């Protein structure tokens, strides 16, 4: 009888030890995420993820979370596909430019709608999370994603070969490289011809006259050497270029609670630094572009810009609302109300 009791005690102890080992093994198992980016590794944001954020994540999770970062060209997807890719769970994280997702989910591009949301440094940041939380909440739910961090690539301007925009006829006969329908409409408003060129071919297109100019930001033009062939910067402040990192909700929900809490605390602590980092880099790249490329800056006249904004509702914003379909007008009105509440003007609405 005593031997039987001893055996039961030993069996119980072994069972508890085995169960503890299984639980411990589960808690400590490595989780592997894949992150696709629209960048090629040269942008400020790409460098921060590779050199700072991913190592930090591995450190604060004690090596339990590993992230495999793939740049454009290392994964098979175009920039425009990344929202769909993260929504489906093909990637756990994506880093891209909202403006490139206009054909997939135009409502998200409200934050980069030309001549609508302010693009002077710091302006969009004032209203951005109100827009996400108050206006776009249902859009994120539809795509099964949420925002982790966002940086801003800086205000978008016209960069031109050997001319300036003086009036509504200055772009007649000129071809301007764009990357979404909203910018197409802006170029058409100025009587120019929008052309689409793959990102890898932009320099050649500018060099050979396939395009006479393009719309981009300072750092992108600087890093890709576009200013060698389009050295005239028409400071237009068309819109900002919002570059968020979205995560698949299932991937996030699959993390242990302690890991979720640690990561959320980390991302919250990095929000301001990450948000303004690229904007500050733009300033450094602008200064460097003067001696490096002999970049010339010509601010668009206030009167011309004001007239463009006044015509933007019919020429740019209304067509965007129509492309959005159901819910587009509600998103536009919701953001317009936030802008007016924050002291910004929304002409024509």
Task: Please give the residue ranges for each predicted region.
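Bacterial N-terminal signal peptides
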Residues: 11-21
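N-terminal secretory/targeting leader peptides
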Residues: 27-123, 138-349
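Bacterial N-terminal signal peptides that target proteins for export
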Residues: 2-12
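Basic, amphipathic alpha-helical recognition segments used for DNA target recognition
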Residues: 131
């Amino acid at each position: 009888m005593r031997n039987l009791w001893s055996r039961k005690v030993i069996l119980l102890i072994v069972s508890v030890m085995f169960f503890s080992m299984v639980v411990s093994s589960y808690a400590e198992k490595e989780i592997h995420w894949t992150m696709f980016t629209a960048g090629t590794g040269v942008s400020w944001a790409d460098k921060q993820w590779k050199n700072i954020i991913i190592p930090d994540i591995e450190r604060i999770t004690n090596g339990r979370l590993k992230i495999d970062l793939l740049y454009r060209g290392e994964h098979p997807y175009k920039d425009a596909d990344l929202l769909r890719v993260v929504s489906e769970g093909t990637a756990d994280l994506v880093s891209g430019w909202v403006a490139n997702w206009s054909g997939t989910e135009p409502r998200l591009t409200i934050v980069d709608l030309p001549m609508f949301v302010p693009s002077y440094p710091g302006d969009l940041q004032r209203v951005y999370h109100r827009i996400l939380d108050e206006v776009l909440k249902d859009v994120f739910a539809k795509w099964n994603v949420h925002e982790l961090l966002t940086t801003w690539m800086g205000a978008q301007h016209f960069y031109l070969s050997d001319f300036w925009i003086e009036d509504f006829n200055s772009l007649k006969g000129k071809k301007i490289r764009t990357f979404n329908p909203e910018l197409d409409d802006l170029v058409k408003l100025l009587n120019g011809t929008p052309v689409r060129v793959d990102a890898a071919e932009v320099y050649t297109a500018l060099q050979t006259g396939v395009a006479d100019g393009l719309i981009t930001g300072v750092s992108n033009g600087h890093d890709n050497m576009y200013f060698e062939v389009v050295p005239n910067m028409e400071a237009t402040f068309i819109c900002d270029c919002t570059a968020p990192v979205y995560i698949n909700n299932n991937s996030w929900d699959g993390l242990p609670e302690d890991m979720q809490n640690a990561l959320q605390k980390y991302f919250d602590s990095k929000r301001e630094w990450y948000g303004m980092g690229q904007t500050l880099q733009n300033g450094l790249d602008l200064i460097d572009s003067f001696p490096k490329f002999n970049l010339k800056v010509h601010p668009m006249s206030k009167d011309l810009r004001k007239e463009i904004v006044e015509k933007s509702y019919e020429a740019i914003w209304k067509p965007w609302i129509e492309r959005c379909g159901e819910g587009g007008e509600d998103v536009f009105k919701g953001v317009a109300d936030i802008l007016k509440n924050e002291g910004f003007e929304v002409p024509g609405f």
